[in-house]
Amino acid sequence: NSYSIAAHEVTNAEYLAFINAGGYEDFRFWHSDGWEWVNTHQVKSPMYWHYIENAWQHYTPKGLLPLALNEPVCHISYYEAYAYAAWAGKRLPTEAEWEVASNKFTWGKRWEWTESAYLPYPGFAKAAGAIGEYNGKFMINQMVLRGASEATSAGHSRYTYRNFFQPQLRWQFTGIRLAESI
């Protein structure tokens, strides 16, 4: 199927438009589990964002700094990424779409959420015994992220690497790249 994928990750400025448009208060953009998560935890913005004295600030390793509007949005959950994509009239790319297109855009600043559940590759067979049981636990309720981040070791920074997190986690350096079917 034909699709297009954004040349850049969603920026803080673009994500701020979602917040200002009431994106965190509009259930139409959220998975039902995501909507429950937002309301239960009273989520109103990405992790480490703080609205202080009429300006958005971002807590960083260097302390609290003004939000860098042109930087990729960071520390968001799959639920937030999905809702932003729905609000923007787009979608998250699948894992396969991201990998096929990855030579056409710059990646590596943020782990990028995909619309793909973390499942074994075709033909995968779980090993017998404890190792199989241990590995099998990771393939439950996880979503795939592709790319790498500024904090990723060189050995894991490759376009084929599959990372995975639970959809509610706002893990280190997670971001958004949009796709759409054409």
Where are these regions (language model features)?
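Short beta-alpha connecting loops at secondary-structure transitions
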Residues: 129-132, 163-164
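Cytochrome P450 core scaffold surrounding the K-helix E-X-X-R motif
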Residues: 12-19, 24-31, 114-129, 153-154, ...
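Short acidic-hydrophobic catalytic motif
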Residues: 6, 33-52
